[in-house]
């Protein structure tokens, strides 16, 4: 019995149309004899098929194939018409005896199978002469062999490849948690779809490769750059870029945008304390990382488990402390410039104090309340003074005239109020 094999449309290219048997053309008398026998028994035995083959002059294997094809056609037609398949009719007839294949015949067939899994009719007839087996039995043997051992016969299995199957230069592919950020008009970082790679492929500690420049976090240009990271001055002075490195090699969300400086103020009139203050949502963000030793843009996280929270350009901040402006307080001391011929960007950074060396020890991570920072900023006199023109609904001259007229009118007494009510 032959095992089920794939149809001709699913066979490999080397098995289709190469040395196949010629199609047998049936005469009308042969077709009538076959159909009459099929009506009596769709599953004829070997003796019935041999008598029918001798009567119509067709080899018995071709008669067997015809019955198989006719049963398939009838079964499909019954399924389309939702009719039950009658199946076998009458007592089962005798089957063909199992063909015994000796060891020498098996060795010849195996050698031929290793050379070609889909031999043509000429190769099968040659094997039939060498082994003494019928060609139809050799064809069935190859069908069964292909069904039992689909990976044998010199056919190499398909190699599966992926996006991260290989890395340039023999390095590890990027891990699955590496994502890039896209900045909009306000610099809001939007995580891009990450590349599906095997996690843990990169060594721990190096979390951003050369693509770290494409995923920066935003900071105002007035703030000093993070320690160990040199950033060029932007053209318009709106934002500068820095890439903080969180611990354990994990990427963090980019910081939220800061409050932009007032458009009416010049660069020199801006308050360095308020401009250097981190935004309302820039809390619990990792501090700046040290530059990688290779100089290829690889950033390493802090070596300790906990790191202090860094305000951009203001040094490490005390955990849990809120920023409170002090009225009348003297501005912080300005550090001396490192070079007399410094550029304009270094001159703008002189109003920002350098980070204290005593506070650079690692401290546990903490999150500052966003509401306190926002309330303090909204309640500051500078902010109220700047927002006063936006809150006024009348011209200043008209407002002063109405206030002066209201102050000249005396309030009504109780008797005058009652008299007014009676008149109404």
UniProtKB/Swiss-Prot annotation:
GO cellular component terms?
cytoplasm; cytosol; Golgi apparatus; nuclear membrane; nucleolus; nucleoplasm; nucleus
* Residue spans of biased composition, Polar residues class: 1-10
Asked whether the UniProt record includes tRNA processing among its keywords, one would answer no
What does the annotation give as the result of altering residue 148 to A?
Decreased DNA binding affinity
Q: What is the effect of changing residue 20 to A?
A: Decreased DNA binding affinity
Swapping residue 69 to A leads to an effect described as: Mildly decreased DNA binding affinity
Q: CDD domains, alphabetically? A: homeodomain
Q: What is the effect of changing residue 145 to E?
A: Altered sequence specificity, with increased affinity for the DNA sequence 5'-TAATCTAATTA-3'
Basic and acidic residues: bias regions: 265-274
User: Which InterPro entries does the entry link to?
Assistant: HD, Homeobox_regulator, Homeodomain-like_sf, HTH_motif
Tissue specificity annotation? Isoform 1: Does not seem to be expressed in normal muscle, but is detected in muscle of individuals with FSHD, and also in testis (at protein level). Isoform 1: Does not seem to be expressed in normal muscle, but in muscle of individuals with FSHD, where it may be toxic to cells. Isoform 2: Detected in skeletal muscle, fibroblasts and testis from healthy individuals.
Pfam families named among the record's database cross-references: Homeodomain
Keywords of the record, alphabetical order, are: Activator, Cytoplasm, Developmental protein, DNA-binding, Homeobox, Nucleus, Repeat, Transcription, Transcription regulation
Q: Which regions of the protein are recorded as binding DNA?
A: 19-78, 94-153
Disease tied to this protein: Facioscapulohumeral muscular dystrophy 1: A degenerative muscle disease characterized by slowly progressive weakness of the muscles of the face, upper-arm, and shoulder girdle. The onset of symptoms usually occurs in the first or second decade of life. Affected individuals usually present with impairment of upper extremity elevation. This tends to be followed by facial weakness, primarily involving the orbicularis oris and orbicularis oculi muscles.
What family classification does the UniProt entry report for this protein? Belongs to the paired homeobox family.
Entry text on domains: The two homeobox domains are arranged in a head-to-head orientation when bound to double-stranded DNA, each domain binding to one of the two DNA strands. Together, the homeobox domains can be considered to bind DNA with the consensus sequence 5'-TAATCTAATCA-3', but due to the head-to-head orientation of the DNA-bound domains, the first homeobox domain binds to the consensus sequence 5'-TAAT-3', and the second homeobox domain binds DNA on the opposite strand, with the consensus sequence 5'-TGAT-3'. Both homeobox domains confer nuclear targeting. The C-terminal region is required for efficient activation of transcription from target promoters. It mediates interaction with EP300 and CREBBP.
Q: Under which name does UniProt file this protein?
A: Double homeobox protein 4
What is the species of this protein? Homo sapiens
